[in-house]
Amino acid sequence: MKEDCLPSSHVPISDSKSIQKSELLGLLKTYNCYHEGKSFQLRHREEEGTLIIEGLLNIAWGLRRPIRLQMQDDREQVHLPSTSWMPRRPSCPLKEPSPQNGNITAQGPSIQPVHKAESSTDSSGPLEEAEEAPQLMRTKSDASCMSQRRPKCRAPGEAQRIRRHRFSINGHFYNHKTSVFTPAYGSVTNVRVNSTMTTLQVLTLLLNKFRVEDGPSEFALYIVHESGERTKLKDCEYPLISRILHGPCEKIARIFLMEADLGVEVPHEVAQYIKFEMPVLDSFVEKLKEEEEREIIKLTMKFQALRLTMLQRLEQLVEAK
């Protein structure tokens, strides 16, 4: 079913399904009542007879493999003229301004590339790669009770090269040599979407938000139910509408970002057995085997009876000749 062929009283769920606008608005009202007083309430409007719903969509991380971050941001770097630099002693590193407030809050694994201006001393020749320590430095916000260590004295050129390819993820700095990151399984982030955005568009928006180098075709969105049932959202579906249809409570159903090749759909018939212990499942298997054996015996007896009837009929035909 194409969107152009839909009546104005219906809203598309996918390319082959739709829902009545009045029914969807009723579900939206329930959704907003559940999130009353919170930022997750959804707004709706109509444009040329088309219902558009927009707001924040929670997506949980369900990745098993690390994701690679982009080495450079899309934003243009700011180059300061050499006259603006004050003369410094060559044996001291460039100091970074410390945050005024030590407590920094972030929603989800926020990834921000850190760029510094290049000094005129580095523009005269090619930069050499500086060897990095395998351990990552922790920021002041992540370790409030850690004793502060005096930073090692570096040459200005070396310090500039280190800052140039550095990323910040929740206060942790990652160099481009180790710019891989695995979000905690089940941790939640959110993106602002609308009801006209397909699964592929939402994936692209989420990956761009965190500067993930991997393409959207390598990932998929799944609806994971409390029972263990897992359904993959097709590329033609609309995640925000799917969220409304499954209700506002994320304890019952959540949207997960998973790898396209590792995510597996779990139908309802299988999900109802997931939470049972192994001894109980073994007893189910034994019962099914017994039932299977009884069915085999019944079919065998039926086949033998039919075979005997056919043989008797053939003998009668031969005697008649």
Curated annotation (Swiss-Prot):
Gene3D superfamilies, per the entry: Phosphatidylinositol 3-kinase Catalytic Subunit, Chain A, domain 1
S-S pairs: none
Domain Ras-associating per the UniProt entry, residue ranges: 174-262
SMART domains named in the record: RA (SM00314)
One Pfam family in the UniProt entry: RA
Region (Disordered): 79-159
Keywords: Cell cycle, Phosphoprotein, Tumor suppressor
GO biological process terms on file: signal transduction
PROSITE patterns: RA (PS50200), SARAH (PS50951)
Domain SARAH: 270-317
Skewed-composition ranges (Polar residues): 98-110
InterPro entries reported for this sequence: RA_dom, RASSF1-6, RASSF4_RA, SARAH_dom, Ubiquitin-like_domsf
Tissue: Widely expressed. Frequently down-regulated in tumor cell lines.
Sequence positions bearing Phosphoserine: 141
Function comment: Potential tumor suppressor. May act as a KRAS effector protein. May promote apoptosis and cell cycle arrest.
Quaternary state and interactors: Interacts directly with activated KRAS in a GTP-dependent manner.
Protein name per its UniProtKB record: Ras association domain-containing protein 4
Organism: Homo sapiens
Taxonomy of the source species: Eukaryota, Metazoa, Chordata, Craniata, Vertebrata
Gene expressing this chain: RASSF4
